[in-house]
């Protein structure tokens, strides 16, 4: 039995590669079922965000190569290209990695809380797909518990920062007074919701939320006193926007160079600040070629968050210690779990012997034997049969020179120098 955590993230792969290896919500269930069908994987879950695509697996033996080959084939890129930026963690290292990810210790923004919710969503989708069972399920529950402990027992979450907060911080650097700025937010998911709240707190003059469905855009807009439009209405609104921040799950770009050029003309080339948080990207990279556009992607946010990270570095060590403890606790419980099946089988074996010997004793009594004789026969039968298999195996192992088996037997049966301890 083996646990694996493999994939790519913002530290190992560029945004170009990450967007090619990303899974859309619509792909997830079938991808999980296909993964379990065509690779030697018993249980699986997929976490796909703008900063990482990771697979969490339970296999009988480590078969990472087969999974990487499937991942490359699924996303139509070469195996060599994927291997160049992929990582594979096995067993306790896989457990530790999952717990670090869920705790925000492996995030672009140290300690950011959104990743835990994203991991819980990944677990829920895996349950829907039927690809997660008792073993991976236990690992997810242990991961969530450790992440909660990290969040409550350390200062890792203080001075809240996130990709959303970093985007707004960058906007504040470019526009000294956000209260005179107008913002267009594309999408209505968790990240855009956080962006909207941060902008609202900064007193942005006007916020417009554009989404594929008006219902979700309206719900977010109502919360903040903003305006809601459909994606199709963006060209009519774009020229009003000083700030454009986009994060959707679209497979195709939402904004192209031509649309932005038209908006700039209507703005008389007043600068526009744009942040594309999506993977795959919502805003064509060519937009960044325009003179009056400041276009940033998630990979450009590193410097913005550097200052905020300093305040969390002290808490990171305490968080790492909690993750190490959580990892060891889970692995210990897993080792104990491995003994359960053996103990269950041995108990069933002992109960069969007990039932057989009890039946013999009852027949002796029915045939007129004394209770003393029946009990003596029962005791001898139980002793001989319970000791028979261990005795045969110990002699065999001793003859083979397996002296460690004798020491283990003494420990197993709590024997000391060949006799039972009083």
Swiss-Prot record:
Biochemical pathway: Porphyrin-containing compound metabolism; protoporphyrin-IX biosynthesis; 5-aminolevulinate from L-glutamyl-tRNA(Glu): step 1/2
Catalytic activity, as annotated: (S)-4-amino-5-oxopentanoate + tRNA(Glu) + NADP(+) = L-glutamyl-tRNA(Glu) + NADPH + H(+)
Binding site for NADP(+): 187-192
Top-level taxon in the UniProt lineage: Bacteria
GO molecular function list: glutamyl-tRNA reductase activity; NADP binding
Keyword Oxidoreductase: yes
GO process terms (BP): protoporphyrinogen IX biosynthetic process from glutamate
Binding-site residues for substrate, renumbered to this chain: 49-52, 107, 112-114, 118
This protein's UniProt keywords: NADP, Oxidoreductase, Porphyrin biosynthesis
E.C. number: 1.2.1.70
Catalytic site: 50
Quaternary structure, from the entry: Homodimer.
NCBIfam families in UniProt: hemA
HAMAP family: Glu_tRNA_reductase
Role of this protein: Catalyzes the NADPH-dependent reduction of glutamyl-tRNA(Glu) to glutamate 1-semialdehyde (GSA).
Note: During catalysis, the active site Cys acts as a nucleophile attacking the alpha-carbonyl group of tRNA-bound glutamate with the formation of a thioester intermediate between enzyme and glutamate, and the concomitant release of tRNA(Glu). The thioester intermediate is finally reduced by direct hydride transfer from NADPH, to form the product GSA.
Free-text note regarding domains: Possesses an unusual extended V-shaped dimeric structure with each monomer consisting of three distinct domains arranged along a curved 'spinal' alpha-helix. The N-terminal catalytic domain specifically recognizes the glutamate moiety of the substrate. The second domain is the NADPH-binding domain, and the third C-terminal domain is responsible for dimerization.
Matching PANTHER family: GLUTAMYL-TRNA REDUCTASE
Protein name per UniProt: Glutamyl-tRNA reductase
Native organism taxonomy: Bacteria, Pseudomonadati, Pseudomonadota, Gammaproteobacteria, Pseudomonadales
């Amino acid at each position: 039995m083996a646990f694996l955590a493999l994939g790519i993230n913002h530290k190992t792969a560029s945004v170009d590669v990450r967007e090619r290896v990303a899974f859309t919500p619509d792909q997830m269930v079938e991808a999980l079922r296909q993964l379990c069908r065509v690779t030697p994987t018993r249980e699986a879950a997929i976490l796909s965000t703008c900063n990482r695509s990771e697979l969490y697996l339970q296999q009988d033996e480590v078969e990472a190569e087969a999974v990487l080959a499937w991942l490359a084939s699924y996303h139509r890129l070469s195996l060599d290209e994927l291997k160049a930026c992929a990582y594979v963690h096995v067993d306790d290292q896989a457990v530790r990695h999952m717990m670090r990810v869920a705790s925000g210790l492996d995030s672009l923004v140290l300690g950011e809380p959104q990743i835990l919710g994203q991991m819980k969503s990944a677990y829920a989708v895996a349950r829907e797909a039927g690809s997660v069972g008792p073993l991976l399920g236990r690992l997810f529950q242990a991961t969530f518990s450790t992440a909660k402990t990290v969040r409550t027992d350390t200062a890792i979450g203080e001075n809240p920062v996130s990709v959303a907060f970093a985007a707004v911080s960058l906007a504040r650097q470019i526009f000294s007074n956000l209260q005179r700025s107008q913002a267009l937010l594309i999408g209505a998911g968790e990240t855009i919701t956080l962006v909207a709240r941060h902008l609202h707190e900064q007193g942005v003059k006007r916020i417009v939320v554009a989404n594929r469905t008006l219902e979700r855009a309206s719900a977010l807009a109502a919360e903040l006193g903003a305006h809601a439009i459909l994606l199709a209405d963006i060209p009519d609104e774009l020229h009003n926007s000083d700030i454009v921040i986009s994060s959707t799950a679209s497979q195709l770009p939402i904004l192209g160079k031509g649309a932005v050029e038209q908006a700039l003309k209507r703005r008389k080339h007043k600068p526009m600040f744009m942040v594309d948080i999506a993977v795959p990207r919502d805003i064509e990279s060519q937009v960044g070629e325009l003179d009056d556009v400041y276009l940033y992607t998630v990979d450009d946010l590193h410097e913005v968050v550097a200052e905020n990270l300093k305040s969390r570095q002290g808490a990171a060590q305490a968080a790492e210690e909690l993750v190490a403890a959580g990892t060891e606790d889970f692995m210990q419980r897993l080792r104990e779990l491995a003994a359960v099946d053996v103990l269950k089988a041995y108990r069933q074996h002992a109960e069969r012997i007990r039932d057989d010997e009890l039946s013999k004793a009852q027949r002796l009594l029915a045939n007129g034997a004394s209770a003393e004789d029946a009990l003596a026969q029962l005791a001898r039968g139980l002793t001989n049969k319970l000791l028979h298999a261990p005795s045969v195996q110990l002699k065999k192992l001793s003859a083979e020179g397996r002296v460690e088996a004798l020491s283990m037997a003494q420990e197993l049966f709590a024997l000391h120098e060949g006799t039972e301890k009083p």
